[in-house]
Amino acid sequence: MKRALISVSDKSGLVEFAKVLTELGYEILSTGGTAKALRDAGLTVTDVAAYTGSPEILDGRVKTLHPKIHGGLLGRRQDPRHVAEMASQGITPIELVAVNLYPFEATINKPGCSFEEAMENIDIGGPSMLRSAAKNHADVTVVVDPADYPQVVEALRSGGVPLSMRQDLARKVFQHTSRYDGIISGYLEAQSAGAAMKFPSHLFLQFEKVQTLRYGENPHQQGAFYRELSGREAAVARGRQLHGKEMSYNNFLDANAALEVVKEFGAAQPQGGAIAATSPPRGVTVAAAAIVKHNNPCGAAIGDTPRDAYMRARDTDPISAFGGVVAFNAKVDLPTAKELTATFLEVVVAPGFEEAALAELKRKKDLRVLDVGPLEADGRGGLDLLDMNLLGNRRAQSASTLRAPHTV
């Protein structure tokens, strides 16, 4: 009988996945809340404690750290010595592992999270099982992301998970555990240094590829766009493209520059026909718009409405604004959208679009429309990392939170 070891915090798709494994003849090994969820769904589950013959100890801190578990994951099926040693120790192979980790990052981001709560959400057994299974991916299928359940199910139903897929899944495991450890390390350093820490001794950054670009800054250069995984600040990198052609390298540069300008004015929201900034400098009520072309601002202004702000920004230099990128600190309404579609623009960036405004913008087939979400989530106060084309180096400085006084 084949065995699948399942222990997850994120239970998305869990029951459906386990049902397929059961139908395919797998014995399900599990612990704690995962085992309960599967039993509640009517599935047969073998507790890891019963399988290993060792009870959970230390308030559940030690559940799966056992030779019968890790031997079943690490033993090479094609090595006669491993097979014989496993048999002599009563260790049976485990063919599939589905594990995801305690939600450490979500825990430390909760308001009021205590140090003790954070420590209890550092997973030990999960990363150990993932790493053992991933190391021996020649024999074991390991799944850390519930989004991969469907492709694994399809492969199993088609005769087995191919080595190429197992290798790709193993790669995802090491990427996941690497980021997990980096977040823990960063948290502990911040805790030990306290408020005095501005620049950590080490920076652990991870990015995921959003898209491959047609070319880079120049046509002879290749390019790709990446998103930082741990960022929370409203940003072009975390925006959703609602319409238009694929974003280019220079579109991203210009959109980012324009958005950073309007973020200087805080997040504006409708309030009784005017615009009220949720974090405006000196209490001034403003809508803000900025126009950037070739990474250079060619117009920026404030006004009582997004339309007013845009018209003022455009009138700063109408010729340069043609074919530019426009960003707002307020939701785009229909009057603003009509002004935007009256000329040629590459990209419009905003923290939201009214339905009628979006329909108006979609009349321009190629116009890229980017929704970056609420600017209230602006998490400024961290570090700005500067790539100054110094090979092997990054410069860092505290984020600029200075707000210049202004009037409408």
Where are these regions (language model features)?
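ATP-dependent carboxylate/acyl-activation modules
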Residues: 1-4, 181-182, 190-270, 275, ...
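Glycine-rich nucleotide/cofactor/substrate-binding loop typically near the N-terminus or early
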Residues: 33-104
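Internal alpha/beta core interface subdomains
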Residues: 15, 20, 91-232, 238-239, ...
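Short beta-strand segments
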Residues: 7, 74, 97-102, 123, ...
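Short hydrophobic/aromatic-enriched beta-strand-loop microsegments
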Residues: 25-29, 43-55, 97, 141-142, ...
